[in-house]
């Protein structure tokens, strides 16, 4: 509910009026003076402050909450012969995916970490 209220204050030579109508507030200052040529002068300054309300609130999920999936593993696909039973295809592809995941994790560790490269080089030298 918007109700209009008005407040008037008179200071020495200046009349100040403030009007509030809920979401807007207007302040008017009128200053009267006499110039050096004995002319009456009036100066009016007015300022309006408007308070705006918005009902379009954006939820947190719409403000750019982005998740990305980064996979450093290798993706391998193998083509099975037509005579292969379905049960062995599932097992084979699962094992292949599992191995490629481990290889991808190891590859990511080796490329991102200089210490891992050094350790793997030492281990390869010991094995050979």
Curated annotation (Swiss-Prot):
<dbReference type="GO" id="GO:0016020">
    <property type="term" value="C:membrane"/>
</dbReference>
<comment type="similarity">
    <text>Belongs to the flocculin family.</text>
</comment>
<keyword id="KW-1133">Transmembrane helix</keyword>
<keyword id="KW-0472">Membrane</keyword>
<protein>
    <recommendedName>
        <fullName>Uncharacterized protein YAL065C</fullName>
    </recommendedName>
</protein>
<feature type="transmembrane region" description="Helical">
    <location>
        <begin position="105"/>
        <end position="127"/>
    </location>
</feature>
<feature type="region of interest" description="Disordered">
    <location>
        <begin position="1"/>
        <end position="26"/>
    </location>
</feature>
<keyword id="KW-0812">Transmembrane</keyword>
């Amino acid at each position: 509910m918007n109700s209009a209220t008005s407040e008037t204050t008179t200071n020495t030579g200046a009349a100040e009026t403030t009007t509030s109508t809920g979401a807007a507030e207007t302040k008017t200052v009128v200053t009267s003076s006499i110039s050096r040529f004995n002319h009456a002068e009036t100066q009016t300054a007015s300022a309006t402050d408007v308070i705006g309300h918005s009902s379009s609130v954006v939820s947190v999920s719409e403000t750019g909450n982005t998740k990305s999936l980064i996979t450093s593993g290798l993706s391998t696909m193998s083509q099975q012969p037509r005579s292969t039973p379905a049960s062995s295809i599932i097992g084979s592809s699962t094992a292949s995916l599992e191995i490629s995941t481990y290889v991808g994790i190891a590859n990511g560790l080796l490329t991102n970490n200089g210490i891992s490269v050094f350790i793997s080089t030492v281990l390869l030298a010991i094995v050979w």
